[in-house]
């Protein structure tokens, strides 16, 4: 992130100057610096037809990932993948999400939004395991998309955790207030100011934000508003609470129309917010993805044990069919990829530095063709080994 380190090691409102902010965000994204991108629209990089060819080899994939990481860190802070998901698969997923939302409403437990007025939208919290348990085949077709793995590995490295919050903004739903995202973006200004300046610069590397369009999103439906390059403004977690900065955002944000199946991913420090749905009859649905580093903490708790068991049959079928990359992508979403925290009294590493992770266990089960009962037993045994035992008989 650009901007000088706060002189006392902590940011305060006095460090937030609009002139400095404008110097950071009022620049142009140069397509020539991103050879794998197809276009720049409103300062946002758009990727599409070039990707499959450029990622066909290990070396080519690494080059693309390095470019994506640079785009998120030092570039516009946001990238769009055109046609990232098969629209037919998206429609099947949307049916599952609508059924869950209908059940929430019938039960009187409709979910709201952090940054928008109540009643604007319908949301499913913690949708990964809900989706997998309800429709494992649809889940597998959906999360087999390589785009999530490509950019998640580029920004976070391996063993990341995907969480999901499908969100429907109804006609007339008002825009969100401009903000940054989790972690420091989910604190009030005083809480954020308690963290030292270096933490403000490091925390965006713990999370990747994404959104998959589940319907066509012309501008009148209110697709997400972005301020490209704003992730580079170091005191931004303090600044976005200021009306001076949100006012500037309101006058200079950009919106990109999206087609069903397009996906946008962005640095969580980017100033952004969902737009007003001015359409008469379009319920704008997006699957909001939050991908967390193995070194961080996700917002949603995911029952990865149940999700792994639910997908096991599908994983074995796809492995037998030679769809190995899809299986790896799905295991990265379904299972816990990091071995810690654990109870090292019980879960001791044997012949290696770390215990076996849940993702490694699931991959072994797929490769070796375990039956369902063996997987359930091994998952339960692993969970027991990982559970703290102090004070228990």
Q: Language-model features: where?
A:
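Catalytic core of Fe(II)/2-oxoglutarate
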Residues: 239-314
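Conserved catalytic-core segments centered on acid/base and nucleophilic motifs
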Residues: 152-153, 199, 209-217, 224-225, ...
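Catalytic core of non-heme Fe(II) oxygenases with the double-stranded beta-helix
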Residues: 150-151, 176-177, 184-248, 296-310
